[in-house]
């Protein structure tokens, strides 16, 4: 399960801002919002059939999307193992910052042309493991960097299907392990 807490609009967009939080409808009985269905289609390309359900809402913010997640895993796991695995993933940045404005500001001040290219920024103190099989937490989505990196990776995969991982390593110096 996950909840997408979306920004109202991008800071560069003059319209579309909302005055207060707005909840989204569940259009699918199986998936909830389209986000879980989109993720399910993506995972199916890797022959993974996951039980996903999502809800969505917009907030009156222009900074970053927030994702609340609740994952149930088959094998027992500890919080330390979750932290270690997240920290080992070069596309994941960890942070103690609990406001999107602070993470956005870090990206503006230190990121490549003001952008964070990591796929996600996990807020460490929100991570929780319950009953050794349920992982819960929050993460922020660096929207611009996320779409830029995904587009580059997709292009490289199309051009170099057997070597795209090697090709995108030139960007690794632009990823952050800690924000």
Language-model segments: what does each one mean?
Residues 1:
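A contiguous active-site-proximal alpha/beta segment in oxidoreductase catalytic domains
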């Amino acid at each position: 399960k996950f909840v997408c807490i979306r920004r109202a609009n991008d800071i560069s967009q003059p319209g579309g801002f909302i005055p207060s939080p707005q909840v989204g409808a569940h259009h699918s009985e199986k998936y909830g919002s389209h986000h879980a269905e989109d993720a399910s289609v993506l995972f199916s390309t890797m022959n993974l059939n996951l039980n996903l359900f999502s809800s969505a809402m917009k907030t009156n913010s222009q900074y970053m999307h927030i994702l609340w997640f609740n994952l149930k895993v088959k094998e027992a796991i500890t919080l330390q193992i979750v932290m270690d695995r997240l920290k080992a993933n070069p596309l994941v940045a960890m942070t103690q910052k609990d406001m999107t404005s602070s993470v956005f500001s870090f990206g503006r001040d230190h990121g490549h042309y003001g952008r964070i290219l990591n796929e996600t920024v996990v807020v460490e103190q929100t991570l929780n493991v319950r009953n050794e099989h349920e992982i819960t937490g929050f993460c922020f989505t660096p929207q611009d960097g996320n779409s830029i990196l995904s587009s580059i990776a997709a292009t490289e995969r199309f051009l170099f299907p057997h070597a795209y991982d090697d090709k995108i390593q030139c960007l690794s110096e632009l990823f952050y392990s800690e924000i």
